[in-house]
């Protein structure tokens, strides 16, 4: 395919036009009085959202240069969303302001490389200042406040704070759609996985269709069980101990399954067989997690253990196990705390090494099942459009709250960024074009606060000047129009969100400024007369 090439100012201005188109659509959502954006979908109802990254992903521009510019800014929003879960609109607004200031300086003859260095040094100094001034999250109310700001809803904030309080910071909080109106919180004790009983004959409570085992032994096996002779020696030992048995294996079938079912129906021996979750290496890892949690061992020929020679010392224990047709929950496994902590650290290290979003998510789930717990927030709404929008807001707010616990919180409303810059620039000694680049950052950090003010119907420049002269932590509460102590008023942002937004915006701005040529695909022209030469009767012209 033929390519088009643009150089110098033409290249940079083309990219800037694309960036401005995208940023202008996104920035109307910023702040408590920000508006929503409606996104058309090819199928189903349109989506209404105020989430920066969701809006950015939907924007596709026709002009090749503008398209590339928009894609670069999408990357800012996406990276900020991946790292911090929020702050995507702030990052987009910052990127737009940084590029605008930087291009003005490049056009005036400044060295793009020196500007880039100045931007990077200023960004690093501000990021350090942000972390220095961050306040650690100490109360449930602070978590509720930061989540409520992200979701724009106090009730959502309180529910997330309660969920985090119950499952801990390692726990997983998932959001599901509910058929009922409103919000519900469902908590899971212990480890839960998505596999139920192999046969409904294992049920102990026919009304609820679940099997409940108190103080059971737990057999963990990496292979199938079909031959009852392999299982019998172990079954006899468990029966002598007068305890129920939970079997988690690749599968239980044939005469082995029939034997377990017959003994359960006769009341001779209480047991439940469940398929192990996952596939391949992930299944092995999850079985090992369960072994450590319950204080047992995975019986596998790989480690020289055979089912026929297994004894009770290889089995895990738990206070209770509840199995439904779809899921199994192990409550209070009898594993050694030190071993569990070691396994948790192993999984954490794997999460840091992994570069796949999917793998990271699965590892995070495993971590939660071992170290914390699982909370499910069920959201309902009057219409499908509102439900999707609400679910998305809750997911963002959950990640926002986790970011707040990680690095602490700052005054919200764009104030912390502005005030941290004033402090950071006191010790920054730069000269020439590097100083010009740093100055671009100093001017650009006002953009989020100005945009919040504009969306609230106020004059952005006037608000920014006033906030610069206030005590650190004091600023504009855009919801009320009052200037006050934002931390005390519960208007807070996670330091991780603010820092990530600035660093990602600066990274893309530096790329914009140092771009000297852009290569894009040349749009293909439709073949002349292709449509005109087509047979209007589709090749059936002779038929009457």
Curated annotation (Swiss-Prot):
Its EC number is 5.6.1.7. It is an enzyme of class 5 (isomerase). One of its GO terms (cellular component) is cytoplasm. GO terms for biological process: protein refolding. Its main location: cytoplasm. SUPFAM superfamilies: GroEL apical domain-like (SSF52029), GroEL equatorial domain-like (SSF48592), GroEL-intermediate domain like (SSF54849). One of its GO terms (molecular function) is unfolded protein binding. Keywords: ATP-binding, Chaperone, Cytoplasm, Isomerase, Nucleotide-binding. Together with its co-chaperonin GroES, plays an essential role in assisting protein folding. The GroEL-GroES system forms a nano-cage that allows encapsulation of the non-native substrate proteins and provides a physical environment optimized to promote and accelerate protein folding. Forms a cylinder of 14 subunits composed of two heptameric rings stacked back-to-back. Interacts with the co-chaperonin GroES. HAMAP family: CH60. Belongs to the chaperonin (HSP60) family. This is Chaperonin GroEL 1. It comes from Saccharopolyspora erythraea (strain ATCC 11635 / DSM 40517 / JCM 4748 / NBRC 13426 / NCIMB 8594 / NRRL 2338).
